[in-house]
């Protein structure tokens, strides 16, 4: 089967997040070492990453949350995505998970690359009525890492109290060099207000090209189509109760 063109926008992207007991951390680390190739080979998977997460309080090297793990998967079809829970990878995480959640996403905008690819294609944009998820991901240049980490605390502190923020946490493929953030917002206006009007975040945006922090970067925005499972795994705030989503105990 030929690979879709780089500009092809997937119909469905899913974010799976698992909360595990601390006693299961060694088993989670083993899965992170062995499961990525199996995840990429699942039928219907166009692009996939297994990710560690952070608490979202600082987005720095000391922010790791070893009791929460995630997978971001780009699918060819919704039917293929529906088979994930019964796949060897899905069952493997379910065996050690205390709780879990799946977020169904539609790409709205995306720029940049991840591992040399454009996994979300070239979305045309458009209006979104309802919650949006913002994903930022970068591979830091080692010589610039210290400067980057010093710039993060003011942004993290500002994000914590941002109006309309429903959930936020860090994600990463490795402890230091491959960093990202996930944030969920009540609507696009709240995201735009924080991203472009908050002084700390604007300062970081301005410094990015001049500091040369990133060897590779990607910024994407998604419509949140559904939240299935225990949204507290995402750190969802009480305001999230206003969002329509399927909840399963």
Task: Give the location of each predicted region.
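Short S/T/G/P-rich N-terminal loop/turn motif that feeds into the first structured element of a domain
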Residues: 1-68, 78-84, 96-180, 190-197, ...
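Extracellular/lumenal glycan-associated surfaces
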Residues: 74-77, 186
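A common structural junction motif
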Residues: 89-97, 201-203
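Active-site/pore-lining binding-face segments in mid-to-C-terminal subdomains
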Residues: 186-205, 209
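An exposed tryptophan-centered "aromatic clamp" motif
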Residues: 213-214
